[in-house]
C-alpha cells in the first residue's frame, strides 16, 4: 500500500471522526474543548511531517503550516475585532482546518474556508427568517467550519 494514500486516509478518517464529535459538542454547548482540538492539531502535524519524510517532499507540509497560520490568524483577527463573534475554540479549530485544507492544496483551502462562512450565513438567515433567532443570538460556528472543511477536501 502506498504510504501517502494511507496517511491521507488517516487524516480524512481522523478529521471526520473528530469533526463530527466537535460539531455535536459545539452545537450543544458553544464550546470546542482544548482537550480535543489541541491533540488533534498535534497529531495532524505529525502526520503531515511523516508525509513529508515518506514522500521526500516538504511542499505539502510547508503549505499546511502556512494554511494553519493564515486561517488561524484570520479567525484570531475576527475574534479581536468582534466582541461576541468568534470564540477561542473557533480560532484553534481554524489552525487544524487550515493545516488540513492547505496540505491538500490552495484550492481546497479557499473552498473550505469560504464555504464555512457561506454555510453559516445561510443557516443564520434561515433562523432569522423563521423567527428563531435575532441579531444577538449566538450561533455555534464550529459545525460550519467542519462542514466547510469537508467540502474543501472533497471539492478542492
Regions found by a protein language model. Name each.
Residues 1-156:
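A membrane-topology feature that recognizes alpha-helical transmembrane segments
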